[in-house]
């Protein structure tokens, strides 16, 4: 499970954690949001500037490094990821996409471990300005989420065929005809 809203974790840092877990090729990856329960220690920690929903389940709405707009986007990200990847309705196409994205995953893990020598250097302070944009799983699903939002799909309840059409058009917009064909296969066998 990944939790959005942990201390010092901005959107980029969350993306690194997502990529590290995605590279393990899980059949599902659950994304949750930090809840600030009444009486909890973290709720009283002022340095994180937590703002949470006043009603249960008291989910975090913003932190000192994660503004509301990023948390809102990650809510949509979680919906899109759950709807398409975690549903396992499209195993073949996301297996193919996952294998491509994992190959392009950064050469180092979140700890900075060199994957060739297994040497772990001393931990350095995380600097989000030094994170390179790559063709990784987090970026890919962010693009998918943005396309979902741009199409206004988050405002309506789409039928399965409309969700499949969205995916098909998204894959084609990425120039990935193989993914589009695998989607057709998944649709036929499910």
Model-predicted segments: where are they?
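Radical SAM enzyme core and accessory elements
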Residues: 79-190
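A structural motif corresponding to the C-terminal lobe/cap of the Radical SAM core domain
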Residues: 1-104
